[in-house]
A protein has these predicted regions:
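Compact soluble domain cores
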Residues: 1-65
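Basic/aromatic recognition patch in beta-strand/loop cores that engages polyanionic ligands
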Residues: 56-82
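A short, surface-exposed interaction/processing loop segment used at functional sites
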Residues: 76-114
Length: 114
C-alpha cells in the first residue's frame, strides 16, 4: 500500500445529514458540544499521524474505506475513499478484548463486506 498523507481539513462527513446522524449517535461519547465540534474531532482523529498504538487498514470491498483505531483511547473511525468520514465512535473495552486487541478489531472491521 503506498504511503498517503492525510491533512486535517480534508475529511468531513459526506453531507449535513450524515454529520447530524453520527453526532446524534456518538457525539455524547466525546462530550462534543454540537455536530460541528464532533466533526472536527472526527476529522482530527482521521487526519492524525500514525503512532505505535494506532492501527489502520483498508477494506478490501472496493470502497477504499480506511478503518483506524487508537488502542490508547479506543477511538475508532472509518473514512470513505480517504476523504470522507463514515463514522467515528469509542469502542468498548469488552469489544476490543473479544477481537483479541485493537489490531484484531480494526482488521475485523476491514474484513466487513458492507
Amino acid at each position: 500500500m503506498p504511503m498517503m498523507l492525510y491533512i486535517v481539513g480534508t475529511v468531513p462527513f459526506l453531507n449535513a445529514w450524515q454529520r447530524s446522524l453520527h453526532f446524534t449517535k456518538h457525539g455524547h461519547e466525546f462530550g462534543a458540544k454540537n455536530e460541528f465540534d464532533y466533526e472536527a474531532m472526527a476529522e482530527a482523529f482521521m487526519g492524525a499521524a500514525m503512532h505505535p498504538n494506532m492501527h489502520e487498514c483498508y477494506r478490501s470491498t472496493g470502497t477504499r474505506d480506511r478503518c483506524r483505531i487508537d488502542a490508547n483511547t479506543r477511538h475508532f473511525g472509518v473514512a470513505f475513499n480517504v476523504l470522507t468520514v463514515r463514522t467515528y465512535y469509542i469502542v468498548t473495552t469488552a469489544k476490543i478484548i473479544r477481537f483479541g486487541g485493537a489490531d484484531g478489531y480494526v482488521r475485523a472491521q476491514c474484513a466487513m463486506t458492507r
